[in-house]
Amino acid sequence: MNGADLLCDVLLANDVTVCFANPGTSEMHFVAALDRKPQMRCVLGLFEGVVTGAADGYARMTDRPAATLLHTGPGLANGLANMHNARRARSPMINIVGDHASYHLPLDAPLTSDIEGLASPMSNWVGRVKGPADIVPAAEAAFRASLTPPGVTTLILPADAAWGEVAAISPGKVKLAPPPAVDMAVVHTIAEAIRAAPDRVGMVVRGQAARADALEITGRISSGSDVRLFSEVLIARMQRGRGRFAPTRIPYPVDAATAMLRDIDLLVLVGAKEPVAFFAYPGKPGRLVRDDCKVLLLAAHGQDLKAALEALAAEVGIKPTQQFAAATAFPDEPTLSGRLTDDAIALSVARKLPANAIVCDEAVTSARRFFALSAFAAPHDYMMGTGGSIGGGIPMATGAAIACPDRKVINLEADGSGMYTVQGLWTQAREKLDVVTIIFSNRTYAILHGEMKNVGVNEIGENARRMLDLDHPALDWVALAKGMGVEAARADTCERFDALLDSALSRPGPFLIEAVI
């Protein structure tokens, strides 16, 4: 048995059974070890951003880490953007990064780099295997760090540690520390503060507090204590749809966000951070609440958020029978016809969404109406990029489909963002994943046109336009998808889009719709 075999055994002993990979020469012993472990599902990504993004989507839907396999520093660097999104989503992930043999590093071969320096900003934990004898403690430490609390870990595996001989052992399960107990003193303080600020209290939820069972508790608190419930701008995962309490999403634009929060005197955070502006703008605030708004943390990431909400509900006197408002029927919206628009797509997808679907939203500006409509759709899970790094949508949908093969995955994807990791379509085809990708083909970086206005530039010239528009030539998404092995078709009318969506939802995927808007 060599170190690579033992590393596989540690992962499998702890139910890490999927490895998203783009290996190179330094990882060949680990690839050979994986070949001897049929219990491990190995999924190839043709670009490392697909690998890390898929691991993110998988983790969000399972609350468990997958492994990734990346080739030295440059391979890791190619995957950093979606590691950033995963870190912001607080997704558990174990990145295995191969490196040169330890004795080869002083020779400064072409692929030698500072892997620790590259990994650290996008990881919650970074470790290096010191040798074959260190495989078990290092791998167990990486696994433990990925879940307590959940986050991104990176384990560097030198080639000589992978090929070095080790004694044959059977690794056991890593014992994880339970989440910290609810702090009842904090609960009491927040309950008193809620009572002292009637009708002027907000609560921001994320993580486990955005799951259906926790949202039911927050719904009762909201209706029984006049607390306004919010979600963050970027949502890692939220369970939405008819019958579920629907938090109001804090808007992305600073002016709209500050207006929404202007009357809040007390903001309670449940697994969330205080909302701040995405960027700094001249003359606009960075904090979105008033300076005199009191901000209190009920429970942080890694704590038992549902238990904290239950304790708070009891402390403010909310009965389990307290009713709350939840969407029960789709609003009376006319069926649109003629030229396809982003609103028509949002309305059609929300109406037709299958029960228990998973929506991965990276449509950026084009699908903003969908989130509001999704409260009235069939019950589903909703996810989006959380770190502002584009190129996560197609990989995230890929990972979610592997995590939940019995559920339909809908990827709402901007054309500009999709091009960052278009290779993920090939993985969907190879793995026969049930994903419907809807490309919002507006042939521009629309969000950046808006950002130009946000900084005071209302009219742009030819140079700026050439950096912000995606025409001359226009992207042919049908051809791109077919080249990756994914069936695809184009729609430019509402009628054509509805017909294609009905067809795509009626059979297993993958399928791509280029929606020209």
Q: Where does each model-flagged region fall?
A:
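N-terminal alpha/beta PP-like core and its mobile active-site loop of ThDP/TPP-dependent enzymes
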Residues: 1-322, 435-437
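Thiamine diphosphate
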Residues: 96, 104-111, 369-517
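Short, well-ordered beta-to-alpha junction loops that form the rim of enzyme active sites
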Residues: 157-160, 206-207, 232, 362-366, ...
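A short acidic, amphipathic alpha-helical/loop segment
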Residues: 33, 81-82, 213-220, 348, ...
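Short acidic loop-to-helix transition motifs that present clustered carboxylates
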Residues: 27, 48-53, 76, 366-368, ...
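Active-site diphosphate/adenylate-binding microenvironment
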Residues: 3-8, 12-17, 22-25, 30-37, ...
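A general structural motif
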Residues: 47-48, 107-109, 176-191, 250-251, ...
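Phosphate/pyrophosphate-binding active-site segments
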Residues: 2, 133, 271, 275-367, ...
